[in-house]
Amino acid sequence: MYGSSEFIFNVFGFLILAGIILDKMGIRFTGVLSASLMFIGASIKYYGVSDAFIGSGIETWLNSWWVSFPGSAKLASLGFMIFGCGMEMAGITVSKTIAKWFEGKEMALAMGLEMAIARVGVFAVFTISPWLANMAPATVVRPVAFCTLLLLIGLLTYVVFTFMDRKLDKQLGLDAKGNNSSEEEFRVSDLGKIFGSKVFWIVAMLCVLYYSAIFPFQRFATNMLESNLGVSAQTAADIFRWFPMGAAAITPLLGSYLDHKGKGATMLIFGAILMTVCHLIFAFVLPAYPSTLIAYGAIIILGISFSLVPAALWPSVPKIMETRYLGSAYSLIFWIQNIGLCLFPAVIGYALKFSNPGHIDGTAYNYTLPMVIFASCGVVAMLLGIWLKAEDRRKHYGLE
């Protein structure tokens, strides 16, 4: 329940509303709103896990219903829901912001640097949080407080950015919402144009298939390595946690290549192929030849794939969608992606249970079937990439 609470509002339509707000109100308002939601959500979660919550009237009321689910978990889930809304809204706002500031310039490099910094941040938090939690006395409150502080710094940083963006609008002759007064404004009916675009659906389905084989895989990766290599959970986690760092190092370089040489659709195809190869190695090679060297090799391949696809995918959206509804286009892609990310872990969990009947706790799992399912997503994503390349050749979007 807690793990899925981050996606609940987004799957049930908040992301669509977020895109409309972004296109109607502009990047400054939406950015501050999204950063505020993340900070508020984290603050609620912090209160829910802190000692101040224990014995409070809120705890008494929350524990009076659905007694099998602790009151602290209920409040933390509420905070995580609010945080999740802000996080996804921030994602589409950052994408549209970079598209605005770097249109006609090094947009793919800028997006690559943004993704690289984000992945370094994820690595840092996953490294620092356990250390903070295990400091005497051990408590989960400390890392939550640390992350809440980071979100406050992020909110203040974006407020500073709004002054810079307002100055840019004056230089470009844009209105208060960052729009060109001579261009047609966003209308809610523009959502129909997005849904009616064939190339939008190709990109959206490629996105959901690719990321469904990345993020849900991360949930199972540690146990998969533990089962295949016969190592401890900590050792397996230490092997896999370097995956985002490899992607962070390569993504800006690929973004720069995309800006100067193109080949965006080709990069998507190769990224999907590499992901398929990685999951097939985990499905068949690693179980037959348990080796940390093979595991690291497959993770490096996945890291290159995770650089190729995002570096080419997100800068491609402004080329296929009009600027006035670009925010809604990003939000709808994120919305479709969130549906996949909500459902796919359950599919993999069922496949794992199906292929391991009568599994005894403490023994290794057979991950062949789940890895084949992940690889199948890569195959379909590759075919969609080929289709996208053909559409680009016909319609001249400029992806290549």
List the predicted regions and their residue ranges.
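Extracytoplasmic gate region of multi-pass secondary transporters
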Residues: S197-T251, P310, F344-P345
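Cytoplasmic helix-loop-helix junction between adjacent transmembrane helices
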Residues: A73, S77-I117
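C-terminal ends and interior cores of transmembrane alpha-helices
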Residues: S36-S68, I273-Y289
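Cytoplasmic membrane-interface "Motif A"-like loop-to-helix N-cap segments
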Residues: D23-A35, D259-I273
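C-terminal transmembrane helical hairpin of 12-TM major facilitator-type secondary transporters
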Residues: G264-L313
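Central cavity-lining transmembrane alpha-helices of secondary-active solute carriers
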Residues: S4-I20, R241-L254
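Flexible cytoplasmic inter-helical loops of multi-pass small-molecule transporters
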Residues: V160-S189, K395-E400
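Helix-loop-helix hairpin linking two adjacent transmembrane segments in secondary transporters
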Residues: E114-D169
